[in-house]
């Protein structure tokens, strides 16, 4: 017969939670670095969609 499963220990739970938070922190740091490079104008290694207002201003000049 099927037996009830054992409760996950607090240490295992904390370990999984720490891994999840670590991955989230790394993604947040990457997003912040990307945003900073776009705002500072140091974005040479990637492409991102331009706003329509910026395109209209460039077309008028």
From Swiss-Prot:
GO MF term (any one): structural constituent of ribosome
Record carries keyword Ribonucleoprotein: yes
InterPro entries in alphabetical order: Ribosomal_bL32, Ribosomal_bL32_plant/cyanobact
Keyword set includes rRNA-binding: no
Region described as Disordered: 1-23
GO cellular component, one term: large ribosomal subunit
Signal peptide (from-to): none
Biased segments, Basic residues type: 1-10
Any one of the GO BP annotations: translation
Pfam family, one: Ribosomal_L32p
HAMAP family: Ribosomal_bL32
Protein name: Large ribosomal subunit protein bL32
Lineage, uppermost ranks: Bacteria, Bacillati, Cyanobacteriota, Cyanophyceae, Gloeobacterales
